[in-house]
Amino acid sequence: QDAARRDFTCNALYYNPARGEITDFHHGVADIRAKRLVMIGDARARYQEDPVRMLRAARLSGKLGFQVAPDTAAPIAECLHLLPKEPLARLFDEVMKLLFSGAAIDCLKQMQALGMDGQSVHPLLACALERLPENQGRGIVALALNSTDSRLRADQGVSVGFVLAAVLWPQVREAWQRAQSSGLRTMPALSAAVAETRAHMEKGWGVPHRFTASMREIWQLQPQFEHRRGARPFRLLAQPRFRARPRRRAAHPPPGSVVP
């Protein structure tokens, strides 16, 4: 019964340490060997039962390098409308698992391959998907996610606030430019753009305040990058907000860091 409640066949394997045996109720071993992600049961019914499984399909297949089985992928398009009805906190948690999976770029590309446009899932993913191709894949979003993937694969700590600030910086920058065009000076315009973006994040996106606070600090430091002489650039590089926390094995990770 427990095996039948699992979502994918690769997650329904049971190991008996006393006998050194794996019990496989749903042909999961064969699917793993074939690098194939297969839903247990009727995929449409399982997505309707728990829409977050669609995000899990993109994340697991992207991270593991699996192909999603046709019967598992086919119902996603008609079930996508169910995802926004899920609690914001749960969706945000799944978004974090995807962005900090160690294979964020591959997971996002898999979302696209499965027909999952970011806006139907979560605004953070919509921003990431929209900006990913910028500068031939070397824009700020792609660079930040690639750097995060590399650090996670190297078992190093990462800063959630820094990564999310990078993903949303193009949006903040555009709002900043609009505010300046309306007549506001540099810093008041930036503060207005940051406040506008934070309001969206905290009310409609489910992003916790502890992350938006560090993101605000990072955004408000951006004008200082224009000062490139003397000691100021070196002081800026030493800013704690631009430094990832060291990896720590702890029951409760420090706020602002992710330990996969």
Residue ranges of predicted features:
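Catalytic cores of the polymerase beta-like nucleotidyltransferase superfamily
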Residues: 1-260
